[in-house]
Amino acid sequence: MKKIVLALTFVLVGSFMLAGCSKDEILNHYNNIVQSASSIELTGKLSLQGEKEKGIDDYTGTYTADYANFSGTEYLFGGTSIKRESGKELSIDCTLEITEGTAKVFWISGSDEAVTLIEATGTYSDIITLPDGGNYIGIECESFTGSIELNIE
């Protein structure tokens, strides 16, 4: 019962806050809420194996790491913006060095299957266009020893 009352209260408060707002203002408010919630998907700074410097938003920045027998997935950059202020294009430059195990840098968009950007020792450079909705760039590792340098603008 308390959950229903709480949910109804949020709906009413939200309605009052948005009353008198234009369609664009409502969309901007919604976009801000969705973007704030999306940062939960990113791997926390303390849980990362390397060093991350945030760029102008959660979609951009640099990440460098040296891995030693690491297995797991790190979601490094991204979010769920409906209308990203900096546009839909991202420039990605990545250098991956695999000494042992496997590692792949990927891009996942919405409910689509992840797209592998690089999974062998070498470099990757491209510009991708983000569709609306959730977009994340990460690295998936299995007993991975090696390094990564990732720059996204």
Residues of each region from the PLM?
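Positively charged n-region of N-terminal signal peptides that target proteins for export
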Residues: M1-V5
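C-terminal motif of bacterial Sec signal peptides marking the signal peptidase cleavage site
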Residues: M17-G20
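Transition segment at domain starts
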Residues: D24-S81, V115
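A glycine-anchored, Pro-Gly-centered beta-turn/N-cap motif
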Residues: G61, P131-N135
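Extracellular and analogous surface-interaction loops
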Residues: N69-L90, I127-D132
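A short beta-strand element within beta-rich, extracytoplasmic domains
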Residues: K88-I98, I139
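Short, surface-exposed beta-strand/strand-loop-strand elements in extracellular ectodomains
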Residues: E100-T116, I152-E153
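Edge beta-strands of jelly-roll/beta-sandwich modules across compartments, strongly enriched
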Residues: C141-E153
